Amino acid sequence: MLQVIISPAKQMRAAQDAFEVLGIPPFVRETARLHRALLDIERNEGSGGLQALWNVSDKLLGPCLNTLHEFGPILKNGDLDNPDIARNTSPAVMSYHGIQYQSMAPEVMDDEQLTWLQTHLWILSGLYGCVRPFHGVEPYRLEMGAKLAVDDARDLYGFWDDKLACAIAPTGSNTTVVNLASVEYAKAVLPHLAGDATTVTCLFGEGVRNGKPIQRSTASKKARGSMVRWMAENKLEDVSGLTAFDVGYRHFPELSNKNTLVFLNEQAL
């Protein structure tokens, strides 16, 4: 079983389009708990406490607070029938609006490609844990690396513990996890994978220095989105097919191994 993990985007929108929400995320009660924790910070420390946690400018603080206050935790599928919640809820893959998602361009995929996404892709999230592309989500601000202590956990890595790994690659499923997530998000999953799971991390380089790929954040985000789209277009089911990826990059076997595939920008070859 092939499962792909990617990071979310900071930019979000309540996408008003024709794409239907297909169910709710797997950890709705945990999400509600984290939402309460954010409200507790505002009540006890004021908006400054949240500004420090979110690491946002004065200009962004107001919109982030509005997003927090408009958030209505969804605890069951029936909550999607609530107009106040429904108008703020969209399929996750349409809600995130960063470079990676623009490169993926799910809004122009056909039905078979979207079905592949829903079956094989997991979007990691500080607030939701992990979601399928068409699970309903609301705009929020909470990065996985945020220093948010909740209950007995000193941060979100402790809060989520092995929950995400168990959802993505259940014990006994012999899952291959294709890691297209940033280090910040990948470490919420990879250390907790069961022994029968395997991981392949894809790195995208703009050149080579001292025998290592030169990675640049913006280019890597764009390449990750392109790879997800390419996998959906080719309905990839076997990790061995990844080396054929050729959208602006080429597999570079000299720097790769069984757990890490390196792709270099074609202009650098």
Q: What function would you assign to each model-found segment?
A:
Residues L2-V108:
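Active-site helix-to-loop segments that bind/position phosphate- or nucleotide-bearing substrates
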Residues M104-L269:
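Internal, well-folded beta-alpha domain core
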